[in-house]
């Protein structure tokens, strides 16, 4: 049985977050509601989740010694990676020493690197994926492109949110896509994956939660990406029963192989009744922000319950719902958001402003949420709300 103590006392149940972005912030809020003591760690001060945690630390999370020092000092009951860019080898060591990593240190390690998770899905689990090659050099990359043909997609093996990702349509794109991939990787220059392009009808995120009572799937989330970065999402995505069953089979296989407890965002390509595995994140997913308005238990509440070993008997979905991001471009350390009355004037709308301390270039600073009678109406309403927000830099 789960027991939760008193925060800041010897009985406290402590959860430490590695990464403190907007997704972590929502999980922290859910844990705070359950009386959990929360420590937020990130590489910059005043990150969103730090603003709602009991305390925080600023370190380079790719520095294994620094990460170990914070974790040994805090002695958390649970370590929750919120981003990929972490010294995962240190998490593996800490897990072996008795710490609990959510969902598992191996899941964090495999999914930090596209190669690890792709080989697990395609080669070990024999799940359908796009054809692919890995390459370390421009020569090997050029050969991979030639082999797979156009169009194809190139991504750094270590990157997130579409950074370094390109769609190649002709030989003219080969050099510039390579250069962009080399700039966009999290660990600097290096290895890339080249994937054959799947001419899919749509892509989904199947939010899959592994909890004390088994595995539960949320209704499928449809989404629209630009340059690999999410712009809007909606739930439920209409699917054939065959495609949905196959999506659940693939998601169950991948999440079972990764093990542990928690929320997983399984990204899939769908064409008719066919399903291909794309990627998985062993944590809440940005496209799942829609669940803040579409479900009685959001993906963040589900993650919190799973972490703590609490039951998830049922997830209620409230009908057609959508999210639209509030994207800010420019430079500021004091961004302000105006015209919020107009943004929230329609019924069944909500906003989340993430409280990020600065914008330098283009950054997702918030999200608008909406429910309506149909997916089309919900998407349009969420977009109206998002566009109504007047951003002042």
Curated annotation (Swiss-Prot):
It catalyses: N(1)-(5-phospho-beta-D-ribosyl)glycinamide + formate + ATP = N(2)-formyl-N(1)-(5-phospho-beta-D-ribosyl)glycinamide + ADP + phosphate + H(+). GO terms for cellular component: cytosol. It comes from the Bacteria. InterPro entries: ATP-grasp, ATP-grasp_carboxylate-amine, ATP_grasp_subdomain_1, PreATP-grasp_dom_sf, PurT, PurT/PurK_preATP-grasp, PurT_C. One of its GO terms (biological process) is 'de novo' IMP biosynthetic process. The keyword Ligase applies. Keywords: ATP-binding, Ligase, Magnesium, Metal-binding, Nucleotide-binding, Purine biosynthesis. One of its GO terms (molecular function) is magnesium ion binding. Involved in the de novo purine biosynthesis. Catalyzes the transfer of formate to 5-phospho-ribosyl-glycinamide (GAR), producing 5-phospho-ribosyl-N-formylglycinamide (FGAR). Formate is provided by PurU via hydrolysis of 10-formyl-tetrahydrofolate. NCBIfam families: PRK09288.1, purT. This is Formate-dependent phosphoribosylglycinamide formyltransferase. It comes from Pseudomonas savastanoi pv. phaseolicola (strain 1448A / Race 6) (Pseudomonas syringae pv. phaseolicola (strain 1448A / Race 6)). The lineage of its organism: Bacteria, Pseudomonadati, Pseudomonadota, Gammaproteobacteria, Pseudomonadales. The gene is purT.
